[in-house]
């Protein structure tokens, strides 16, 4: 739980910094492409740090006794795997759509690009905090449904706020949206471990869940963009995202702690 939270905090923390500084950097450097180049050294540093780790892992693989009849196939026949994949699909569709369209929504309401960038920083900053807290709390809660539903309600409140009263409390809506999405995603990552019988089964579950959820969620931003093009407004976009939260909440309630683990069943 804590490891998942720290990973989320690192990702969202740097994303918040990038959101807040990219537009000012573009103003200073005179071009948005130069602003993006500023982040190249960080990517290069990550590569430099990771290469030795990958080489060491390849030279000294962990010794694990694997039964001869162990399966490496994805758990397509597992009902638990499909529940987790469906949950992550609903969450990812909303997250990537919000990531793509929150700033343009407020630019359409008269905000400058810099102001919209700061709003995105608040959105990702809230994800940092909730993404760190949620999986840590999950370690101390026997039933994940309470945290899953709470995350969904926070995110849904943010979506409803942007839809129904976008100019009333935009910073609050961005914070609620970020807190809900950050917690929901971090909890989803933790479920990939909780609902697996072994680390090897967790890898199988993760591969299947990510294949399903990211393939479906990749269409989210584009589909919401089509809605905006057709209607000429972002209002219906946020109404639809709030509607997608309904199946996420239903799936959250079905993720009981006593579900059969992937690998502990024939899948």
Language-model-detected regions and their locations in the chain:
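Juxtamembrane intracellular "pre-TM" segments in multi-pass secondary transporters
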Residues: 55-84
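Structural signature of the two symmetry-related core transmembrane helices
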Residues: 146-160
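Extracytoplasmic gate region of multi-pass secondary transporters
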Residues: 79-122, 126-131
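Helix-loop-helix hairpin linking two adjacent transmembrane segments in secondary transporters
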Residues: 5-58
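Helix-to-loop junctions at the C-terminal end of transmembrane segments
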Residues: 130-143
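Intracellular juxtamembrane helix-capping segments at the cytosolic ends
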Residues: 183-197
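Interfacial helix-cap and linker-helix signal at transmembrane-aqueous boundaries
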Residues: 17, 21-30, 106-107, 137-138, ...
């Amino acid at each position: 739980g804590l490891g998942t939270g720290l990973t989320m905090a690192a990702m969202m923390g740097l994303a918040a910094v990038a959101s807040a500084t990219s537009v000012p950097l573009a103003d200073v450097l005179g071009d948005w492409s130069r602003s993006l180049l500023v982040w190249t050294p960080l990517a290069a540093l990550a590569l430099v740090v990771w290469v030795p780790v990958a080489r060491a892992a390849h030279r000294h693989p962990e010794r694990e006794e694997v039964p001869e009849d162990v399966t490496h196939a994805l758990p397509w026949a597992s009902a638990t795997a499909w529940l987790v994949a469906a949950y992550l699909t609903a969450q990812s569709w909303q997250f990537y759509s919000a990531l793509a369209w929150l700033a343009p929504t407020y630019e359409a309401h008269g905000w400058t690009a810099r102001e919209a960038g700061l709003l995105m920083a608040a959105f990702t900053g809230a994800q940092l905090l909730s993404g760190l807290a949620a999986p840590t709390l999950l370690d101390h809660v026997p039933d994940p449904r309470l945290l899953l539903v709470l995350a969904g309600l926070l995110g849904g409140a943010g979506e409803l706020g942007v839809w129904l009263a976008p100019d009333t409390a935009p910073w609050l809506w961005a914070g609620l949206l970020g807190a809900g999405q950050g917690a929901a995603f971090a909890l989803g990552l933790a479920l990939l471990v909780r609902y697996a019988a072994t680390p090897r089964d967790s890898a199988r579950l993760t591969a299947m869940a990510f294949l399903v959820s990211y393939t479906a969620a990749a269409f989210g931003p584009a589909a919401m963009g089509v809605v905006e093009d057709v209607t000429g407004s972002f209002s219906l976009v946020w109404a639809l995202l709030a509607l997608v939260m309904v199946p996420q909440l239903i799936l959250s309630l079905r993720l009981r702690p006593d579900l059969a683990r992937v690998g502990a069943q024939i899948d």
